A protein has these predicted regions:
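Boundary/linker segments flanking structured domains
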Residues: 1-46, 54-60, 69-166
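Conserved catalytic cores of phosphodiester-cleaving nucleases, focusing on short active-site segments
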Residues: 63-65
Length: 166
């Protein structure tokens, strides 16, 4: 297990610190994300998001995506698919300059691969591209991936509560 500390914040997020870097995770009901009534403004416009929901056969589905413009448009553009999205988990950084387009694409690709490996979910992500990243960015992301995966697993568990007030 990876060593990290978790702090619950009043800003509807959890802060995860490891190796001197801090990240934010938000869990937002998809209905609030769609309506824009979630009250969340991430510090960084670069985000990786994970949508959780059920398809028409009641199977668990996940979608991994990225946005270079925050959370207002891209995560909500999946409402017309054949999945009833229930939750959106947002990953971003406290430092608005730490994440960039290549890093979030790399993290997106790694998360998609991890979902495929579990075989527990229907992965509705068509394809991802971790290409275009440089060795320095990859190294930063590789250091963070073990606890990113652990935190996603914990906060995506139904009933997990980290002082949400929606």
């Amino acid at each position: 297990m990876t060593s990290f500390t978790v702090t619950y914040r009043q800003s509807k997020c959890i802060e995860v610190k490891s190796n001197g870097t801090s990240y934010k995770f938000y869990r937002i009901p998809y209905s609030l994300l769609e309506s824009g009534k979630h009250g969340i403004v991430p510090d960084s416009k670069f985000v990786v998001y994970l949508l959780k929901g059920k398809d028409k056969e009641n199977r668990d589905c996940l979608y991994v995506g990225t946005s270079t413009n925050g959370i207002e448009n891209r995560p909500t553009s999946h409402g017309d698919k054949k999945v009833a999205w229930e939750t959106c988990i947002i990953f971003t950084s406290f430092d608005p300059t730490f994440l960039n387009d290549s890093k979030i694409r790399y993290i997106e690709d790694r998360l998609r691969c991890a979902i495929d490996e579990t075989k527990e979910y229907i992965n509705t992500t068509k394809s991802t591209s971790g290409k275009g990243t440089n060795d320095y960015d990859n190294e930063d992301c590789d250091k963070a991936m073990p606890y990113i995966l652990e935190v996603y697993d914990v906060i995506s568990t139904p009933g997990a509560n980290f002082n949400e007030t929606f």
